[in-house]
C-alpha cells in the first residue's frame, strides 16, 4: 500500500499476469524456484493457457476488477477511504500489455535493470524491450532508492 503523498490518500494494488499461472504450477508440482527451468515452465504454461482461452488475462482482469472496482463486496468500505486507487500489473509480453492497456485505459511503465536484462532467457521476457512504453524508469541502484523514486513518480502523476 502506498499512502500519504501530501494530502492524497492513495491505495496501490499490484497484480501479476502470471500470478494465477504460478498457483496452478504449484498444484502441478512446481517447486517455486525461479531458476531458468522454473521460468521456462511458467512461461510455457502461460503461453498454453493464453492460446487455449486467454485464461491468464481473464483471471487477472477478474482479480483487478474485484479489488479495484468494488461493488457490494466487503472491500468497498475499505477502498473508499482512499482518494486514489492505483493498479500495477506486471506483464511482459507486448501483445499482453496492449490487452491490459485497452481493457483498463492504462499507462505503461517499463522498469529497466541492466542485471535483469542480461539474464533474459525465456519466451515471455524476450519481447519486453520491443514495446513503446509511456514511461521508462531505470533501476540501476538499490531497491530502497527505487521505492523512493516510485513515491516521487506517483506523487507527480497523481498530484
Identify the residue ranges that each predicted region occupies.
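Short alpha-helical
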Residues: 20, 94-95
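Small-molecule kinase domains that catalyze NTP-dependent phosphoryl transfer to phosphate-bearing small molecules
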Residues: 95-103, 107-159
Amino acid at each position: 500500500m502506498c499512502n500519504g503523498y501530501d494530502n492524497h490518500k492513495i491505495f496501490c494494488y499490484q497484480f501479476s499476469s502470471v500470478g494465477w499461472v504460478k498457483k496452478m504450477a504449484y498444484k502441478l508440482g512446481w517447486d517455486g524456484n525461479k531458476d531458468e527451468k522454473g521460468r521456462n515452465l511458467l512461461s510455457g504454461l502461460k503461453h498454453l493457457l493464453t492460446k487455449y482461452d486467454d485464461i491468464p488475462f481473464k483471471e487477472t482482469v477478474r482479480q483487478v476488477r474485484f479489488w479495484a472496482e468494488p461493488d457490494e463486496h466487503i472491500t468497498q468500505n475499505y477502498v473508499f477511504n482512499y482518494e486514489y486507487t492505483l493498479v500495477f500489473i506486471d506483464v511482459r509480453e507486448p501483445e499482453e500489455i496492449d490487452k491490459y492497456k485497452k481493457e483498463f485505459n492504462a499507462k505503461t511503465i517499463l522498469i529497466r535493470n541492466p542485471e535483469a536484462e542480461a539474464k533474459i532467457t525465456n519466451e515471455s521476457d524476450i519481447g519486453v524491450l520491443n514495446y513503446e512504453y509511456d514511461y521508462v524508469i531505470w533501476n540501476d541502484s538499490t531497491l530502497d532508492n527505487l521505492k523512493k523514486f516510485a513515491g516521487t513518480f506517483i506523487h507527480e502523476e497523481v498530484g
